[in-house]
């Protein structure tokens, strides 16, 4: 669930539940990845919609590091909204594919980092 977003910061919250658990009593890694991806994608979607242009988005690559079991409430944060806005604008202005890397950090209720994700996005203005 997107819980906060502005031009620079986004937050997506994820609660440990039966449906997203793994056999080890924590949040399944792929569910964490979906929340992390959304925390980066929300900037791109917002700026594309604001531009009123058709722009395609594609994840080219992603990397993840898991530091602690994800239990309870986990919040994924991305603070690269300005970079995302610039990339969308460059894709529209140049008509060329633009790539950028956006990072999302997941923290638990104690503030400890449970996982970090980096997504490499490709943006390209669609031809009319």
Per-range role (PLM):
Residues 19-41, 54:
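Hot-dog-fold acyl-thioester-processing enzymes
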Residues 23-31, 65, 69, 95:
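Residues at secondary-structure transition points
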Residues 11-13, 63, 75-79, 101-103, ...:
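Beta-strand secondary-structure signal
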Residues 70-71, 81-128:
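HotDog/MaoC-like acyl-thioester-processing domains
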Residues 43-82:
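Hydrophobic beta-strand-centered segment that forms part of the acyl-chain substrate-binding groove
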Residues 1-2, 60-66, 87-89:
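Short structured motifs
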Residues 14-16, 66, 80, 123:
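Hydrophobic residues in beta-strands and at strand termini
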Residues 1-27:
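Catalytic strand-loop segment that frames the active site of acyl-thioester-processing enzymes
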